Amino acid sequence: MVKVGINGFGRIGRIVLRNALQFQDIEVVAVNDPFIDLEYMAYMFKYDSVHGRFKGTVEVKNGSFVVDGRPMKVFAERDPAAIPWGSVGADYVVESTGVFTTIDKASAHLKGGAKKVVISAPSADAPMYVCGVNLDKYNPKDTIISNASCTTNCLATLAKVIHDNFGIVEGLMTTVHATTATQKTVDGPSHKDWRGGRGVGNNIIPSSTGAAKAVGKVIPSLNGKLTGLSMRVPTQDVSVVDLVVRLEKPASYEQIKEVMRKAAEGEYKGIIAYTDEDVVSTDFISDNNSCVFDAKAGIQLSPNFVKLIAWYDNEWGYSRRVCNLLQYVAKEDAKAGI
């Protein structure tokens, strides 16, 4: 049993918990969030505008947050070092505030008794892992690791399959990305990113993303070969990667589709899915996969130049991978006697 604490009960924190409840070998024993009280925490978990009402029971009992009869201790500490994870047996912490994303900052959780921290965001210095891509490189001695970003999880899995089969010379990625909590409902100040301060409801907003470059960290042979940008659009959830690549080996689009279909049915099942139906973004709300290859949406200019399209639920699918990463590292840590 993997005993987990969640720091930060925002979009990812809550959806990680929803996913964790579906796994028999994960037990969330505590949640820390200094900005919401216990009653409001229960309300926010029970009702969700995107993923719907939670189908189980949600209660507040004796100072605990109780979901489906499972009690979780609730803390309200601003300083991660002050959270007593050890008192509730939380060996693993999901750091989902979006604030403590470096090794130095996330290490504060270890002072409270946690043994390992999984950052649910890209990190400037912590090792990043993408399920289906580079878990074999995991070192149990690392106490702080990152699950990378939702976009990197989609792009890296797609790029790995294509690169392994045809070779990628170079590529450009655009993610058409749903709104996130850091954006503004109406125009407001955003000193580092002026366009990012514009209202989300009536704009398509160009933005930077490190997702493509991060692929080079999890797939070293692609380092320096991919870059990209983001277009923030006024939808609540589900994003789509548009990857344009130049291939080393010439291939027909039918060959590419077949490779992706086999990947989805075989080694990457549960991480990559394949569709040849006339789908749109809402069809992928609460989808468990990191990457859903859209066979009908891609196009090809020549045997070495192709545009590939892949969908991902940037909330749900990503949170699912956080849980899968927890499962994997717990097993590897146990083997290593950690």
Swiss-Prot record:
It is an enzyme of class 1 (oxidoreductase). NAD(+) binds at residues 11-12, 33, 78, 314. The keyword Cytoplasm applies. It holds the Pfam family Gp_dh_N. The keyword Transmembrane helix does not apply. Its main location: cytoplasm. One of its GO terms (cellular component) is cytosol. Belongs to the glyceraldehyde-3-phosphate dehydrogenase family. Homotetramer. PANTHER family: GLYCERALDEHYDE 3-PHOSPHATE DEHYDROGENASE, GLYCERALDEHYDE-3-PHOSPHATE DEHYDROGENASE-RELATED. This is Glyceraldehyde-3-phosphate dehydrogenase 2. The gene is gpd2.
